[in-house]
Amino acid sequence: MSVLTVALDAMGGDFGPSETVPAAAQALSLLPKLNILLVGDQNQLVPLLQQHALSSHPRLHLVHASQSVSMAERPVIALRNKTDSSMRVMLELVSSGRAQACVSGGNTGALMVMAMRVLTMLPHLKRPALCSSLPNLHGRHTVMLDLGCNVNCTPEMLWQFACLGDLFAKHVHAVSSPKIALLNVGEEVIKGSKLVQETAKLLASDKQFNYIGFLEGDQLISGQADVIVCDGFTGNIALKTAEGIARFFYSQIKASNEADKVKNKSNTAAEIQTSLSVMHPDHYNGASLLGLNGIVIKSHGRADRRALSNAILHAVAEIEQQLPRRISERFIAEHTYER
């Protein structure tokens, strides 16, 4: 059994070590082949490791970092001044080969610029894209990107994102010929901005894609497409709206279930709550920063230990599929990026 090593930014996210340490414990208990490098301030981490009986765990190793990056910090300032931050040290562990992937719930902008500096982009790729897998109505997954890295995009960038999403769907979700769609304000071919229209022409003319046209926002989880491509501004708003609605319904049904228990009523609400749990954002936490010379997983900033543990497991899946190597091979082998 080969050992897989993930570096975890212990100081990242809204809750920091109080959730990252127990998340590491959960992930280690689920995967016997997993090693975790826990990166952060040892003065804060050592007491928590003792509290969770992890001080002498053979598969967890503490890597000290004296600084951390706040959620409000400007990315360029963090890049310049936080060279010993838990985020930066985590990325350097991947760059040096000590870790095969890394996970952070920290500042997204800082993570992107640091990752581009430390790991660099794969050949021929312009920018990284943030990619997530959403559960859909067919019981499968729909890959969506970009989810916030790139607010201003060109058609060539969206074409590259389609390539990344296509590879992700094939190798992570085992979809042989992923159906690719562009997120738009309507399904009709005449609808959409100049960016969307020009990107549609690129995708439709490229025979390597199974391009199916436009999808609207209410079709994100319909299962009509395996990959949905959009700019980071649109994608971030669409995803967070969907997650907010999912959390609302889940919390309402959970409250109804608790009320039923008090009143000794039937278990209908509990059954619905169980069915909907797969739609809860915590269940699919962990967005991939694709296009880099290394595996970088961005967790929700407000993720709890269960959600963070899922992000770590997501990193392991990408290690096993050797995703950066597959992406690099695709872009080196095909020169269609030169448009």
Swiss-Prot record:
One of its GO terms (biological process) is fatty acid biosynthetic process. Its main location: cytoplasm. Keywords: Cytoplasm, Lipid biosynthesis, Lipid metabolism, Phospholipid biosynthesis, Phospholipid metabolism, Transferase. It is found in: Cytoplasm. SUPFAM superfamilies: Isocitrate/Isopropylmalate dehydrogenase-like. One of its GO terms (molecular function) is phosphate:acyl-[acyl carrier protein] acyltransferase activity. One of its GO terms (cellular component) is cytoplasm. It is an enzyme of class 2 (transferase). Its EC number is 2.3.1.274. The keyword Transferase applies. It catalyses: a fatty acyl-[ACP] + phosphate = an acyl phosphate + holo-[ACP]. It comes from the Bacteria. Pathway: Lipid metabolism; phospholipid metabolism. Homodimer. Probably interacts with PlsY. Catalyzes the reversible formation of acyl-phosphate (acyl-PO(4)) from acyl-[acyl-carrier-protein] (acyl-ACP). This enzyme utilizes acyl-ACP as fatty acyl donor, but not acyl-CoA. HAMAP family: PlsX (MF_00019). Belongs to the PlsX family. This is Phosphate acyltransferase. It comes from Tolumonas auensis (strain DSM 9187 / NBRC 110442 / TA 4).
